[in-house]
Amino acid sequence: MEHGEILARLEATIAERRLGDPSASYVAKLNAKGLAKIAQKVGEEGTETVIAALAGDRKELVGEAADLIFHLMVLLSAKDVPFAEVLAELARREGTSGIAEKASRSN
């Protein structure tokens, strides 16, 4: 199975459930609570990912990274930003030094 297919299916599932019944869907429940709650979850998952990495627990790191990506995709969906736009930005940056890319943004 292609990894991109997994992300595309996840994005479609999130979009489908976004406006669903909050009692039946975690995605709908998060969206019903608003953007601030979704953003809070992204922050929490980011912190948990960092903690797992520093603890050296590979299995926990993989699980937390998956949670982080999921919640980031929920946030992007809530803001009507297709994941393809993020991938396009990564493609645009490919082959560019991180230092040079950052300098180009500060001008």
Swiss-Prot record:
It comes from the Bacteria. The keyword Membrane does not apply. SUPFAM superfamilies: all-alpha NTP pyrophosphatases. This is Phosphoribosyl-ATP pyrophosphatase. It is an enzyme of class 3 (hydrolase). Pathway: Amino-acid biosynthesis; L-histidine biosynthesis; L-histidine from 5-phospho-alpha-D-ribose 1-diphosphate: step 2/9. It comes from Novosphingobium aromaticivorans (strain ATCC 700278 / DSM 12444 / CCUG 56034 / CIP 105152 / NBRC 16084 / F199). The lineage of its organism: Bacteria, Pseudomonadati, Pseudomonadota, Alphaproteobacteria, Sphingomonadales. Keywords: Amino-acid biosynthesis, ATP-binding, Cytoplasm, Histidine biosynthesis, Hydrolase, Nucleotide-binding. Pfam families: PRA-PH. Belongs to the PRA-PH family. The keyword Zinc does not apply. Its EC number is 3.6.1.31. It catalyses: 1-(5-phospho-beta-D-ribosyl)-ATP + H2O = 1-(5-phospho-beta-D-ribosyl)-5'-AMP + diphosphate + H(+). PANTHER family: HISTIDINE BIOSYNTHESIS BIFUNCTIONAL PROTEIN, HISTIDINE BIOSYNTHESIS BIFUNCTIONAL PROTEIN HISIE. GO terms for cellular component: cytoplasm. GO terms for biological process: L-histidine biosynthetic process. One of its GO terms (molecular function) is phosphoribosyl-ATP diphosphatase activity. Gene3D superfamilies: MazG-like (1.10.287.1080). It is found in: Cytoplasm.
